[in-house]
Amino acid sequence: MSQLEQVIKSRKSVRAYDPEFKIDKKELEEILEIASSAPSSSNLQAWRFIVIQDQEKKKELTPFGNNQAAIDASSAIIAVIGDAEAYKNAQEIYAQNVELGYMDQAIAETYATNTYNSYSTLPQQVLSQFASYDAGLISMQILLLAKDRGYDTLVMGGFDKVDFAKRFELPENQFPIALIALGKAKAPAFNSSRLPLEKIVTFY
């Protein structure tokens, strides 16, 4: 079994954390930077993050998350935010590609213009769906990177997103998707079963 397979199979949703264990800011930044290599629609990277390490702010967040103990006891909470107007960053993203030598100026300008024109006419609901899907891709990378470094995680989708958005003053184009708790398990996670492959896969 490869190291990647071991990490994938060992990742569990941990709900009980050691409140004394801390992960420093630099390591969280490293995890997020590597995770940002995740694919995204037109490479627009429609994800944003709010990282909460301050204990008082985590306690303030707890009621939004149905008083789940993991919020208060974990080392950090990463709030995954979607950006429905990520297409407005197309020019910046393609300019970076030129600077890094990934494409020439003319191609970059064409891509940036076409991307902006295509996405700017889409309904808000569709843009939000793109952002939510892409946020799922980078979230999985965060979970696996954390596990590879010996940390445990829990993804929480059931929280008061309206109050969260108000508390952290999210602009109208941004919306909360999930909270990810990171830390060190105080108690092992429950094992969970998976449906058999023939139940979920169809080959043609």
Residue ranges: model-predicted function:
Residues 1-204:
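Acidic, surface-exposed loops and disordered segments
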